[in-house]
């Protein structure tokens, strides 16, 4: 497999999903320019948008997101990768060694395939407009709001336990053929860390992996302790100014 191969035919981030107590994160996303544009047809979940960025806020009880919240608190609990053929990509990922996740779906809902990612969070594989099928758009809100000028996801990071950075680098390379584009070794007496920046074959999905340096008592360890495990630490957006 060469560095240009795109075995799962990825073509960018489709969405990032967050979980919290009901309504807890609404003000956060509204403050930075997102608009609530649609509600899920059968679940307590909402689609927020700005530019090309899709954020799903999931408040549904007894869902995978609810269980994720009990373990980690308010957080990014899933992400969606856009692909040309989700069923084909899912089959290929399982053949390569990915672990499938099967979620409970309601009547007339799309069955969106998913595999287990960082911290047990789902990575959904999406090949169509899931929102028109599963969400009801609000009539009085623009479906593609401009907001404050954020228009695309640049990257998101994973904070991992010391010694696990290579494990996750291997995971992304094996399943998706991500490639390393940068390696940082940031020295500091108390806050040193190493970071391996990965990018998907499409060049649109970028995920830096971070772990603490030798002492292991820095900012990465602080996140892992507070979050109660490995996970998505931050998301960076591209803006127009």
Describe these PLM feature segments.
Residues 36, 55-56, 206-207, 216-217:
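Short loop/beta submotifs within extracellular cysteine-rich repeat domains
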Residues 220-222:
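Catalytic lobes of large eukaryotic enzymes
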Residues 66-70, 224-225, 239:
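A generic structured-segment signal
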Residues 62-65, 214-218:
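Short, structured coil/loop segments at alpha-helix boundaries
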Residues 1-140, 155:
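An N-terminus-focused feature that recognizes amino-terminal "leader" regions
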Residues 12-19, 140-206, 212-217, 226-241:
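Surface-exposed interaction/gating patches
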């Amino acid at each position: 497999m060469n560095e240009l191969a795109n075995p799962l035919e990825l073509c960018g981030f489709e969405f990032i999903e967050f979980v919290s107590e009901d309504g807890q994160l609404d003000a956060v996303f509204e403050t930075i320019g997102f608009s609530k544009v649609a509600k899920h047809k059968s679940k307590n979940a909402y689609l927020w948008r700005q530019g090309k960025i899709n954020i799903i806020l999931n408040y549904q009880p007894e869902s995978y997101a609810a269980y994720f919240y009990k373990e980690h608190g308010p957080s990014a609990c899933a992400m969606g990768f856009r692909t040309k053929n989700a069923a084909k990509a899912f089959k290929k990922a399982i053949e390569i060694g990915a672990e499938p996740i099967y979620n409970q779906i309601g009547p007339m809902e799309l069955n969106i395939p998913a595999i287990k990612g960082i911290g047990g969070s789902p990575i959904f594989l999406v090949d169509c407009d899931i929102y028109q099928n599963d969400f009801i758009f609000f009539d009085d809100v623009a479906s593609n709001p401009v907001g404050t000028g954020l228009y695309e996801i640049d990257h998101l990071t994973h904070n991992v336990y010391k010694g696990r950075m290579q494990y996750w680098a291997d995971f992304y390379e094996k399943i998706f053929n991500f490639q390393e584009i940068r390696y940082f070794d940031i020295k500091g007496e108390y806050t040193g860390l190493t970071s391996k920046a990965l990018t998907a074959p499409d060049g649109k999905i970028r995920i830096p992996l971070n772990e603490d340096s030798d002492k292991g008592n820095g900012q990465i360890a602080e996140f892992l302790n507070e979050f109660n495990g490995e996970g998505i630490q931050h998301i960076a957006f591209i803006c127009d100014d």
